[in-house]
């Protein structure tokens, strides 16, 4: 099953010399269970691509088509996208993600806070443990504070 399909995606910014295309006519398809890594030189459009997909491109314009689980997500309202997709089904790990952890809360407390903000009503302990183990971390990590983790561990959290 096609999970994410990006077709003809272009993202541009305006400049005094005209439009600057940070992403130009990108196509890719991800099947359910697949993942993708985006690599490239500084300022080549990696972050712009991600921001375009999650509809958070500030000061730019995006065209093309992005379908998630068969639904075109560029054409739906901002509130529908927020309620149904952004941070629920589609997320982005930003550069410097390690800096987003709150130093005064344990890793588990931070997971709990996120689940509460998203009105999760299931088994907190189970979903948190499943998330941690899915990135090859173990349960004792949940009792630690961010400064007690290595850089790689923070990035996986």
Over which residues does each language-model region extend?
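ABC ATPase NBD coupling module
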Residues: 73-91, 117
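Q-loop/switch helix immediately C-terminal to the Walker
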Residues: 96, 103-117
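The feature captures the beta-strand-to-loop junction immediately N-terminal to the Walker
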Residues: 39-41
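Conserved hydrophobic segment flanking the Walker A/P-loop of ABC-type ATPase nucleotide-binding domains
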Residues: 30-32, 85
């Amino acid at each position: 099953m096609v999970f994410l399909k990006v077709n003809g995606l272009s993202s541009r910014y305006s400049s005094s010399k005209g439009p600057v295309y940070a992403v130009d006519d990108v196509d890719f398809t991800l099947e359910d269970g697949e993942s993708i890594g985006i690599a490239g030189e500084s300022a080549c459009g990696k972050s712009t691509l991600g921001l375009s997909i999650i509809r958070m491109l500030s000061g730019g314009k995006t065209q093309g088509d992005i379908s998630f689980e068969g639904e075109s997500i560029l054409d739906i309202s901002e509130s529908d996208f927020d309620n149904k997709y952004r941070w629920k089904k589609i997320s982005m790990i930003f550069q410097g993600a390690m800096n987003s952890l709150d130093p005064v809360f344990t890793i588990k407390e931070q997971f709990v806070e996120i689940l509460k903000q998203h009105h999760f009503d299931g088994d907190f302990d189970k979903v948190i443990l499943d998330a941690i183990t899915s990135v090859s971390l173990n349960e004792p990590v949940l009792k630690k504070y961010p400064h007690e983790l290595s850089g790689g561990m923070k990035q996986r959290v």
